[in-house]
Amino acid sequence: MIEVRDLRFHYQEKERAVLDGVSMTLKDGEYVALIGANGCGKTTLVHHLNALMRPTSGVVSVDGLDTLDDRQVWEIRRRVGMVFQNPENQIVGMTIEEDIAFGPGNLGLPPAEIRRRVASSLELVGLESYGRRVPSALSGGEKRLVAIAGILAMEPRYIIFDEPTSYLDPASRQRVLALIAGLHKRGLGIIHITHNMDDILDVDRVLVMREGKIVRDDRPEIVLSQGDWLRQQGLGMPAATALLWRLKEMGVSVRTDILDFEDVCREIAAWKSHPVESVA
């Protein structure tokens, strides 16, 4: 389990805290979304979870390992993988297989084990035939998959995805989301940062940050259906939920706690069968 207790962080002593008393957990195999307006502290928080940053005060632990203990940092970073917004920043090899082998190679593993991990990771992300290709020849979506494969080769217990679908075309976006869902089913703990609420409909919990604090921690159908409250946080709703809110504003009596379009269609069909004017 990843556990954060009363985490505070500021760059200089007299500056306002970037993180102000954050407490949270990520259990083994749990899928958690982290949302909030730009500048609220999301990326700073997750950088603390694999010891890329250290707390000013408070405790961050990964399976009982303290991120302030220099002796544990390498193991923490092996257990907690991070996929950044720009995959080019994570690709270091001349070929795809060299890049994916970089992390396991730093673990001092035997060559046969490194080759096994490279092949297994490429298979997991659906790029089995890409090993000898050069990264510069890949599309943006393929580069993101290579970055994920490099993390998987370290055999982590948790993966943090920082806006993994940003700037991707619809097909690549769906491919990345399907991969993340598959990794969750395999038992990995996932933290997913995004501004696209349609990317996180199936998470276990949604954490909302504002001004360095976690201000909401609840199920997605609770958090993502609160249209007025989300607007106050500078956030949007899933497209299906936004449609229902618009219908409600027009006087149509429909539920607004629905997140996907299939259920929206059923809700509208039910209303058409028994139309009732809403007084809300």
Swiss-Prot record:
Protein keywords: ATP-binding, Cell inner membrane, Cell membrane, Cobalamin biosynthesis, Cobalt, Cobalt transport, Ion transport, Membrane, Nucleotide-binding, Translocase, Transport
Domain ABC transporter stretches: 2-236
One Gene Ontology molecular-function label: ATP hydrolysis activity
Record Pfam families: ABC_tran
Pathway info: Cofactor biosynthesis; adenosylcobalamin biosynthesis
Main location per the UniProt record: membrane
Cellular component terms (Gene Ontology): ATP-binding cassette (ABC) transporter complex
Positions that bind ATP: 36-43
Membrane-topology annotation of the record: Peripheral membrane protein
Signal peptide segment: none
Subcellular localization(s) per the UniProt record: Cell inner membrane
InterPro entries associated with the record: AAA+_ATPase, ABC_transporter-like_ATP-bd, ABC_transporter-like_CS, ABC_transpr_CbiO/EcfA_su, ECF_ABC_transporter_ATP-bd, EcfA_1, P-loop_NTPase
Entries under PROSITE patterns matching the protein: ABC_TRANSPORTER_1 (PS00211), ABC_TRANSPORTER_2 (PS50893), CBIO (PS51246)
Function in brief: Part of the energy-coupling factor (ECF) transporter complex CbiMNOQ involved in cobalt import. Presumably responsible for energy coupling to the transport system.
Family, similarity comment: Belongs to the ABC transporter superfamily. Cobalt importer (TC 3.A.1.18.1) family.
PANTHER family, alphabetized: ENERGY-COUPLING FACTOR TRANSPORTER ATP-BINDING PROTEIN ECFA1 (PTHR43553:SF24), HEAVY METAL TRANSPORTER (PTHR43553)
Protein name stated in the entry: Cobalt import ATP-binding protein CbiO
